[in-house]
């Protein structure tokens, strides 16, 4: 038995080492490129990859999750002025990473993962599609060697197209060659290493061809080094970085939740989403102190980790060690990676972020979903991403409220000649001398209260001597707006000489009926508490209603 366990352990270790090597080597150019994408020192991206991978693996629940800086998060950071330029740039970035981690930790400890379901798929697809386009447009300057003027990426791209004579064609050739080589090598046995090989090969072509005007990391003053610059956050930056930190945390948590749902743990159980939130939060706190940019669960890195044979959480830790080793051994050579080559890599990342199948699926879902998709996409293209994310969340919440409120229906329950219970449309008006049993369906909260009230039978001068029974089985709580509707309807029925009975009432609903004045309006004898017997409370209410109607004088 011990031998079997040892063999399994050896297999796991081999798988983790293999995955760690693949992930670590691939992550060096990827991390540098992500730093470039964020408009930061490329080492901020690489440090985030190193520290995020190790810390995330130690504290997340998901075995396969790899915590690194992502393209979407980098685009948000690129729109945060406080972390670009100035003497406090490093401390501002550290503060942003720390705040992002704190938000994630709060979300994890409060188990707020369930709130992500309120974000509609249309918003996510619109946002991620725009992020992909922004990634592409944001690298046009590095790809072409021409930084065109303009207030945003779209205008700068248009100005670049309109100024072909300003394009540095040698840079463009290197960038396009990188894209073509990555795509070509991915379909060979090299596989995931194709990204690394392509960037190295095209960067090496620059000095070989004598194209000294093609920009490299070294030309821009960046130095690839394993010597981490320890940085402390700045309290002064907290107020201006709260909004971008919340946006970054939201993006990371949405992407991380998708990874959690995708990969089961070694025991077959689904990972704990809240624990993954906490792990990502810890990783951000660690990167904040080590000059790294904010990090979150990376879908592409996690997929590569799993495909490369990872078995346990050791794989990302090994990858972090590999990254450090690569920087120590090859740091001086990495300094000469060509900026157009990194731009080509990022443009390919942006292109693959856009998923036409998802866009088509949302587009077919209806006009409301189309509108949400278009609005979110437009906002993300022309508004700083830190605000576009939060507006997208707001759009999702409003959309959810509108959809839920419009789904409220009211049905009348009757017995047919065979004695079966059937449901039909409620009458337009409350008929005289009858028991009318109404069953509401849908979410009964403040936004749906007007829809519910409009669906109730109208009360006229002839609506006398009747009892309307509203069945609330399964409702554990009612909003105050809905309680007000019940109170008004009860008062109208009383003025017409009729009554309102409420049945299958839970204890929580009973407290709200007392507080909202409904109990006083209908009387204690008109409230029928529910229990485990389905239909018992309704039968008692119907019997009481028929007895009350029988006692009424003829009108």
Task: Set out the residue ranges of the language-model regions.
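Intrinsically disordered or compositionally simple regulatory linkers and C-terminal tails
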Residues: 1, 538-555
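The feature marks cytosolic C-terminal regulatory regions of anion transporters and related permeases
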Residues: 224, 352-516, 546-549, 553
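Conserved short loop/turn motifs at secondary-structure junctions
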Residues: 39, 472-475, 530-531
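Active-site-adjacent beta-strand anchor residues
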Residues: 67, 126, 502-503, 531
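Short acidic-hydrophobic, aromatic-tinged amphipathic segments that line or gate anion-handling sites
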Residues: 522-537
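Transmembrane helical cores of multi-pass ion-transport proteins
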Residues: 1-415, 517
């Amino acid at each position: 038995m011990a031998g079997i366990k040892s063999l399994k352990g050896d297999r796991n270790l081999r798988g983790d080492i293999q995955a760690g090597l693949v992930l670590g080597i691939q992550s060096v150019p990827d991390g540098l490129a992500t730093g470039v994408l964020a408009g930061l020192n490329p080492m901020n991206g690489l440090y985030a990859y190193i520290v995020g991978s190790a810390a995330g693996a130690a504290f997340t629940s998901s075995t396969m999750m790899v915590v690194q800086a992502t393209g979407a998060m980098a685009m948000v950071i690129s729109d945060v002025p406080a972390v670009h330029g100035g003497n406090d740039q490093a401390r501002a970035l550290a503060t942003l990473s720390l705040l992002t981690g704190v938000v994630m930790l709060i979300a994890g400890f409060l188990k707020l993962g369930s709130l992500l379901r309120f974000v509609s798929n249309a918003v996510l697809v619109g946002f991620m599609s725009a992020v992909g386009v922004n990634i592409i447009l944001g690298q046009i300057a590095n790809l072409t060697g021409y930084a065109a003027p303009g207030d945003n990426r779209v205008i700068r791209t248009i100005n670049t197209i309109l100024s072909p004579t300003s394009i540095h064609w040698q840079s463009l050739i290197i960038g396009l060659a990188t894209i073509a080589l990555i795509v070509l090598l991915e379909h060979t046995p090299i596989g995931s290493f194709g990204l690394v090989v392509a960037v190295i090969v095209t960067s090496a072509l620059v000095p070989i061809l004598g194209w000294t005007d093609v920009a490299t990391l070294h030309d821009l003053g960046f130095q690839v080094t394993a010597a981490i610059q320890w940085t402390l956050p700045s309290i002064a930056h907290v107020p201006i970085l709260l909004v971008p930190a919340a946006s970054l945390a939201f993006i990371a948590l949405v992407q991380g939740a998708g990874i959690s749902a995708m990969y089961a743990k070694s025991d077959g159980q689904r990972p704990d989403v809240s624990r993954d939130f906490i792990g990502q939060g810890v990783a951000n706190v660690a990167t904040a102190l080590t000059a790294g940019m904010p990090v979150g669960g990376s879908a592409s890195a996690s997929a590569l980790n799993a495909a490369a044979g990872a078995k346990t959480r050791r794989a990302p830790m090994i990858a972090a060690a590999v990254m450090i080793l690569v920087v120590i051994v090859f740091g001086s050579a990495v300094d000469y990676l060509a900026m157009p080559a990194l731009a080509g890599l990022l443009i390919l990342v942006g292109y693959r972020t856009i998923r036409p199948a998802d866009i088509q699926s949302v587009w077919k879902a209806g006009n409301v979903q189309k509108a949400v998709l278009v609005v979110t996409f437009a906002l993300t293209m022309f508004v700083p991403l830190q605000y576009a994310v939060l507006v997208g969340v707001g759009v999702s919440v409003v959309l959810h409220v509108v959809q839920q409120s419009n789904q409220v229906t009211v049905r009348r329950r009757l017995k047919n000649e065979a004695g079966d219970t059937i449901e039909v449309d409620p009458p337009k008006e409350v008929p005289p001398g009858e028991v009318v049993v109404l069953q509401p369906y849908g979410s009964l909260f403040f936004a749906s209260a007007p829809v519910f009230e409009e669906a109730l039978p109208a009360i006229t001068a002839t609506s006398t001597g009747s009892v309307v029974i509203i069945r609330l089985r399964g409702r554990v709580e009612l909003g105050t707006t809905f309680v007000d509707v019940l109170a008004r309807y009860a008062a109208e029925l009383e003025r017409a000489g009729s009554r309102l009975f409420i049945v299958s009432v839970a204890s929580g609903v009973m407290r709200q009926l007392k507080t909202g004045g409904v109990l006083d309006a209908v009387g204690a004898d008109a409230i029928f508490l529910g229990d485990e017997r389905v239909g018992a409370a309704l039968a008692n209410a119907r019997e009481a209603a028929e007895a009350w109607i029988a006692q009424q004088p003829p009108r």
